[in-house]
Amino acid sequence: KGLEEFLVEREENNRIQQLSEYVNPKMRDRKHPPQHVVLHLGPTNSGKTRHAIEAMVQHHTTYPQETVAYGGPLRMLAMEVYEKLVELLGEQSVGLITGEQEINPEAPVLACTIECVPQQGNLLIVDECHWSMDNDRGKSWTNVLQSAEYETIIALGPDEVEPHMKYLLADAYHIETHHHTRLVPLETMLNKQNNIQRFDIHNVPPKSAVIAFSKKSVLALSHDIAEKTGLRVASLYGKMPVDARNTVVAQFAQGDIDIVVCTDVIGHGINLPIETLLFAETEKYDGHTRRNLKVWEGAQIAGRAGRYGLSEKGKVAVLNTKWGTIKESLIKEYVQAATGQIQTELGYMKCIAYPTLTQLGGETIHMKDIPHLMNHWKNKMQEYLQQNPEMRQYIKVSTMETALQNYKVIYQASSQLVEKTQCEPLSTSYTWQLMNAPIDTESPILHYGAQYLINGNTEILRMIIKDLQIHHYSKESIETSYRTLTELMSFALMFGDEEGSIPGLIQRSELEEIESHLIENYGTVQESTVPGRCIDCGGETKAPWLEKCEACFNNRFY
């Protein structure tokens, strides 16, 4: 038996080794390179997006049948660009494509999240191109910049990414660069001792944004500022339903909200008429450890203060709290970087390389071979980088951690069905799409979605949908359900019919009804507890993430 196992294992290793010979770690994977590349580089609030939208409108006006696309990091930002283009060109000419939503997807002018940008067209705008260096989503920017076949590509980003963009787009016939400066001055507010001005919660001025880095911190500050100033305060953070975020942005822009308290989601391209931006902390938990904000991250946030046409200048200062860690020297650097006075770490960071299924051997490989071939691709790419110093300066290989974790869930779901029913495993193509989809590893949509794709069984997915339709009594519960719903909507657009319905399970219109229900429910729910308030006596805790004040904590056993 030992010999048999050894021979089987050796045969399997030989098979994988033969497959790995077809792994091809190419970077530029297009037959038709761009004729023309334009780089619009500069800090936030320097008019880069305005130039890009003007180029889209001009191109469509001249060549109405050609494909023009915009790709950005957020569904909210894509929607903002979509609405602007509709104003200028009319709704018949403009479409929206994100992972969760499609409006008029066959239109000649498209606003998209970067993962949804068509691979071919005539004019492409790539916004926030420094995201190509993001460990999780950077692969999508790198792939579009290196593989998308457009006659003209316009890339927007900070000055530091100029050499990276010129390397990624080096196959273009012509590259021109335009450097922009801020249209509105930005300054650090200083006191008489030349230290950064500090505001207390009771004197936060109107038209301010307060920055903290956790949902509980944001909610606690929102409650305290509203209570002590009497002003209208709203919260903004990543887990909120996108429509709820859009409502806050619109209300702040219209003057219906005086102060917005938000996480670093504001640094991802959200535009608000902010006059004063107050950091409540400069330290965040990034999923692995607590660390100081990098200068480029802080600059993206600080630069949101002072909007062209609405403010004479932007101001940055500090909000005093009992718990926030503030490093004043960093805030000064954020402002200097946001105004182009100093360079940030972006100049030393690298764009993320990630394989395509074609580079692993295509759909002819078996789904069980995917992780082995990804590892071979990774090794070959690292060898290639070692042999190419210029490439090594701008490119690094993705860790592939999230995709491989997703793969394990999908493989387990597939194996359970194969063992139980002797059916065929999930196809390689579906496996690859699903493991790279915007679906959390812990989400039930990943496991049961994979099983649905194998045998069409909708029983568990129906139970999940039923849970989404109940009335919720906390915002946190709604946020969890909304996340599951957006994953289901993404799944439907990837694997359903042209309308985004899942045959035999649910229509697109029903998904949209559930979304409307959750958003309506979200607007009516009042939280029973407020972060930063003791759950026993209602007094202040030392930090928003603590449930009890010190006195109640010390008396918990008495």
Q: Can you describe what each PLM-predicted range is?
A:
Residues 46, 51, 60, 66-85, ...:
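Conserved Walker A/P-loop ATP-binding site and its immediately adjacent core
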Residues 66-81, 154-156, 202-226, 233-236, ...:
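Conserved strand-helix element at the start of the C-terminal RecA-like helicase core
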Residues 114-154:
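SF2 helicase catalytic motif II
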Residues 80, 85-120:
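Inter-Walker segment of RecA-like/P-loop motor cores
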Residues 286, 291-335:
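Conserved segment of the helicase C-terminal RecA-like domain
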Residues 234-235, 240-263:
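Conserved helicase ATPase core of P-loop NTP-dependent helicases/translocases
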Residues 1-19, 29-30, 353-558:
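Non-catalytic terminal extensions of ATP-dependent helicases
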Residues 163-204:
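Interdomain hinge/linker at the junction between the two RecA-like core domains of SF2 helicases
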